[in-house]
Amino acid sequence: MNHTTKKCLITFMIVLFSMSFLFPSVSSARNHTSYAASTASVPSGQYYRSQEVALHSHVQKASLYYTTDGSQPTTQSQLYKKPIHIETDTTLKVSVYKKNRRLSTSTYNYRFVTREDIASSFLSFEYQGMPYRLYIPKNHKRGKAYPLVLFLHGGGERGTDNQKQLLANDGAALWASPEVQKKHPSYVLAPQARNAVDGGFALTRNSQNEIDLTNVFQFSPDLHKAYDVLQHVLTSYQIDQKRIYATGLSQGGFGTYQLNITYPRLFAAMIPIAGGADPSKAGILAHKPIWAFHAEDDSIIPISYARNTIQAIQKAGGQPLYTEYASKYGYDHASWTPAYETPGLTDWLFAQRRSFR
């Protein structure tokens, strides 16, 4: 290499080095854009419940402007100050600005499903004369066992249509909702009891079909059938035997207690709502993870049923979680509405695993 060639090569390298400062690489530019982009506490996806979306940017002293109609945000758009409440299909666009200069724009798409949508994803079966619905986790993997949530409905959902137990409330829908299944893929089982005087997962009516709680602690015929349905499902699918859960409301609340007392080693945890257990037997549940709910002004199932049950469990050394809604809220015999909306409830349930005491 002669002197002239060396000189040209050195000059070229100096120019190239200088240009690297004037024109950052594509990779660097992308990294800068990524750093400047906003982040959302709730990712894009499908949801059943309304969401509170918190926004954040790593850029110091930056301002976030957003729109919820899919249009490009400007400094004239809504300035982000607090979490954004979203409950309908929404395209959220967020732009990060600093000194009136837009650094990035991010798009988040939220789509919502209805209870009917969720119900349609349940399979429909009948076993030994009892209708039941079963949700199978999407994209379940062969050879992998998944948890199962058993839901026992109340007296108003009795029948043979195999639908009311899914559509009347969130007792089954919640566990099969997109956001819960994404975090905790699981089976959801919802049997349906007969609409008869002695029908239901607890005996709450007399021969005149009037509310009568005299025999409410008896193991009802339909609860026996529900247990058989559960056993059938447990042997037919790959269920994690350490993560079988029970929840129920009203008649189903009593049934949830009764199943756990009769088969104390079957369930990992339980969520009984507006129900109760025989205080003389409730001590059996001392080591069971329980989160119970009841309304103080319940006009159908008196609050004493829940209080007496919880006190009996505590006396036996148990530490059940118990949420009682004061009369001022007016929930009456519908405490399952706020109960199934309790923050952290689903995470709490799926965190429980059966022990072998």
Regions found by a protein language model. Give the residues of each.
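C-terminal catalytic histidine-bearing segment of alpha/beta-hydrolase fold enzymes
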Residues: 289-357
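Active-site machinery of serine-nucleophile hydrolases
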Residues: 148, 155-223
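A domain-start/cap signature at the N-terminus of enzymes
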Residues: 30-33, 40, 104-148, 186, ...
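Sec-dependent N-terminal signal peptides of Gram-positive bacterial secreted proteins and lipoproteins
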Residues: 4-29
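The conserved beta1-alpha1 loop
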Residues: 152-154, 294-295
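Short, compositionally stereotyped local motifs that mark structural "simplifiers"
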Residues: 30-116
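Primarily recognizes the serine-hydrolase "nucleophile elbow" in alpha/beta-hydrolase
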Residues: 234-236, 242-284
